[in-house]
């Protein structure tokens, strides 16, 4: 892909691979809801809709990681946490109807599983953007993007190839158990990410480190979590007010709202 395979680059590739291969459970979810929980198509659709909610509020996860550091890190600690959370959710689902015996429990666990991937997606995207800004070579930025999407595609193809046979031969519980392994790869990848640990705590309050842009100059300052949140919201609002993003935003909205055969 034209990108030096440093430990951090390997971590980025691994997280994107997990985003693709996590689709291994897609078919198993449908079979579990219809064949084991005996839900109607309408009820199953509601459960699947609830499970997709974490993807609809992705900006919220970015806002949280930027303003509320965890154990001195904004990226690594959340990546590790989401990996563990996802593993727990899928492991619980692998216990079958003996534990997950109603649609609400299934909805919650599917949503938590989606949260682990959606949150990780936001975190790894921010890391890719940061590395792209640090690089002076535009070709490296393009190669990094190619690597990311290539790993997602590879993971998706692999999961599509094996998912049907695994569900048929082993059942949905086995597939959920296999899926539980993949979030742990995200947790492991977190330790390969380069991020300097910072002491965000003072004697009286937790503080966050934010970047303040001023023309072509950027500087960092330590502020309270509340002030960091206000700073981030102010920055987001200044971006939303720019008319040049309205067109692309409208296109994305219409694209997502339009029915598709997939």
Regions found by a protein language model. Give the residues of each.
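Cytoplasmic membrane-interface "Motif A"-like loop-to-helix N-cap segments
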Residues: 67-83
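Membrane-interface helix-entry/capping residues at the boundaries of transmembrane alpha-helices
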Residues: 48, 65, 79, 141-145, ...
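Helix-loop boundary and gating motifs at the non-cytosolic
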Residues: 1-55, 246-251, 255-262
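Intracellular loop-helix junctions on the cytosolic face of multi-pass helical membrane proteins
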Residues: 1-6, 88, 94-107, 119-122, ...
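Residue-level hotspots within transmembrane alpha-helices of multi-pass secondary transporters
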Residues: 28, 59-63, 161, 188
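Transmembrane alpha-helical cores of Major Facilitator Superfamily
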Residues: 17, 49-53, 84, 111, ...
């Amino acid at each position: 892909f034209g990108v030096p395979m440093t430990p951090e680059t390997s971590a980025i590739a691994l997280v994107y691979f997990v985003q693709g291969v996590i689709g291994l459970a897609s078919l198993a979810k449908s079979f579990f809801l219809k064949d084991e929980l005996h839900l109607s198509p309408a009820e199953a659709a509601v459960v699947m809709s609830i499970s997709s909610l974490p993807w609809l509020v992705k900006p919220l996860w970015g806002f949280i990681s930027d303003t509320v550091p965890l154990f001195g890190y904004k990226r690594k600690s959340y990546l590790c946490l989401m990996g563990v959370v996802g593993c727990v959710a899928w492991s619980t689902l692998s216990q079958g109807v003996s534990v997950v015996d109603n649609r609400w429990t299934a909805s919650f666990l599917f949503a938590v599983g989606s949260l682990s991937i959606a949150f990780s997606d936001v975190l790894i995207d921010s890391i890719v953007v940061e590395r792209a800004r640090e690089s002076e070579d535009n070709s490296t930025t393009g190669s990094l993007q190619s690597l990311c999407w290539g790993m997602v595609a590879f993971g998706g193809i692999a999961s599509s190839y094996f998912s049907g046979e695994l569900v048929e031969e082993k059942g949905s519980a086995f597939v959920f158990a296999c899926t539980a392994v993949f979030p742990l790869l995200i947790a492991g990848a977190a330790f390969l990410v380069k991020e300097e640990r910072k002491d965000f705590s003072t004697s009286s309050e937790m503080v966050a480190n934010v970047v303040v842009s001023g023309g072509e100059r950027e500087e960092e300052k330590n502020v309270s979590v509340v002030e960091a949140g206000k700073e981030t919201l102010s920055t987001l609002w200044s971006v939303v007010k720019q008319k040049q993003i309205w067109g692309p935003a409208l296109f994305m909205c219409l694209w997502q709202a339009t029915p598709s055969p997939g």
